Swiss-Prot record:
Residues 65-143 are annotated as: Domain II. Homotetramer. Forms an RuvA(8)-RuvB(12)-Holliday junction (HJ) complex. HJ DNA is sandwiched between 2 RuvA tetramers; dsDNA enters through RuvA and exits via RuvB. An RuvB hexamer assembles on each DNA strand where it exits the tetramer. Each RuvB hexamer is contacted by two RuvA subunits (via domain III) on 2 adjacent RuvB subunits; this complex drives branch migration. In the full resolvosome a probable DNA-RuvA(4)-RuvB(12)-RuvC(2) complex forms which resolves the HJ. Its main location: cytoplasm. InterPro entries: DNA_helicase_Holl-junc_RuvA_I, Hlx-hairpin-Hlx_DNA-bd_motif, NA-bd_OB-fold, RuvA, RuvA_2-like, RuvA_C, RuvA_C_sf. SMART domains: HhH1 (SM00278). It comes from Sphingopyxis alaskensis (strain DSM 13593 / LMG 18877 / RB2256) (Sphingomonas alaskensis). It holds the Pfam family RuvA_C. This is Holliday junction branch migration complex subunit RuvA. Residues 144-146 are annotated as: Flexible linker. The lineage of its organism: Bacteria, Pseudomonadati, Pseudomonadota, Alphaproteobacteria, Sphingomonadales. It is found in: Cytoplasm.
Length: 199
């Protein structure tokens, strides 16, 4: 499981960058905002990552901040929102703007992203409206965000590492966290989340 990379920015292209870590180049897909934040080629960078594993693919997605990765996981928990659409939304909107749009039910703002039609934007807004405040994206330092970066985030990463889609992993861990409470350990979260995901 690769959660973070620190190395030299080897190249920066459309929709992806290559990070050289000890002579190994990691191809990392990312939103336009993250790619802009990486700076000039040749510079030292740190990028938070999410690994997607499938039968015939292995993809590494990169995020400038851990909170952007948390929002990616939340977005992909919505049916019809895959990695490509989630990255398009994060390219079109700052995390704070995304949170405000969801909290206010402004689906038109979500629909600004490439590949997001009105119906999908409405579904995203409807399903995530009540969850928008949980990540604390406007300040970037709310208690729920720090919790998501701890055992909850680690449990989601563990499930995606086992081959679950980010959306499935997020939903299963959220259900496990609700059942076990805020003080749940990583082991307990993963164990219960696996049972939830298997249903």
């Amino acid at each position: 499981m690769i959660a973070k990379l620190t190395g030299r920015l080897d190249s920066n292209g459309a929709g992806h960058a290559v990070i050289d870590v000890g002579g190994v180049g990691y191809l990392v897909e990312a939103s336009a905002r993250t790619l802009d934040a990486l700076g000039a080629v040749g510079g030292e960078v740190t990028i938070h990552t999410e690994m997607l594993v499938g039968e015939d693919f292995l993809r590494l997605l990169g995020f400038a901040r851990a909170e952007e990765r948390d929002w990616f996981r939340l977005l992909t928990s919505v049916q019809g929102v895959g990695a490509k659409v989630a990255l398009a939304i994060l390219s079109a909107l700052e995390v704070a703007d995304l949170q405000r749009a969801l909290a206010s039910g402004d689906s038109a703002m979500i629909a600004r992203a490439n590949g997001v039609g009105p119906k999908l934007a409405q579904r995203i807004t409807h399903e995530l409206k009540d969850k928008a405040g949980a990540l604390g994206g406007i300040s970037g330092s709310g208690p729920a965000l720090s919790a998501a970066a701890g055992p909850v985030g680690d449990a989601i990463a563990a499930l995606t590492g086992l081959g679950f889609k980010p959306g499935e992993a997020s939903a299963a861990v959220a259900a496990a966290n609700e059942e076990l409470g805020a003080d749940a350990s990583l082991d307990a979260l993963v164990r219960v989340a696996l049972k939830k995901a298997a249903k």
